[in-house]
Amino acid sequence: MKLRFLLVLLTLIPVSLSAQFAPEGGKPFVVEYYYKAKWGYADEFLQLFKKNHYPLLKKQVEMGRMLKVWMDQPRYHTTEDGRWDYRVTIVFKNSATAIEPFDEESLKKQLYPDQAAYQKEEQRRFAILDGHWDVPIKSVDLQ
């Protein structure tokens, strides 16, 4: 009897958790992407980002998949453990659009015919990073 109850309980937990954390489908969905470059490489990272990644994001805005993309950097320094160099904020059309499969590979081939050079520069862009993390954002109503 206890085993049966435990099995039923375990099958219900994922359903309740997914309902609790599911973003609202029709509203814009915001994700912040943080980049922490190795010391002395932030400018190189920015140059490679603008050359190879930003055009992909801009194209997706033009396609309507994303509503807006922008980059911020801190005005002042922080402690090393909390340091980040760039934050890219992407506003997706909705949460479904953010997670549904998207053929970014064909877009890369369209924008960057020299795939060998593109791959090499993208590898470099990530090699000079100390950290990268993504944070989906949920607005809090203060009223």
Where are these regions (language model features)?
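Sec-dependent N-terminal signal peptides
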Residues: 3-15
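Boundary of Sec targeting at the N-terminus
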Residues: 19-20
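Acidic/histidine-rich, surface-exposed loop or edge segments in extracytoplasmic proteins
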Residues: 25-40
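Primarily extracytoplasmic ectodomains and periplasmic/lumenal surface modules that are beta-strand-rich
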Residues: 39-44, 96-98
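Short amphipathic alpha-helical segments
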Residues: 43-68
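An amphipathic, aromatic/His-enriched active-site/gating alpha helix that lines ligand/cofactor pockets
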Residues: 59-67, 81-83, 89-138
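A cross-kingdom feature marking solvent-exposed beta-strand/loop segments within repeated
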Residues: 73-77
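Short, solvent-exposed mixed-charge patches
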Residues: 142-143
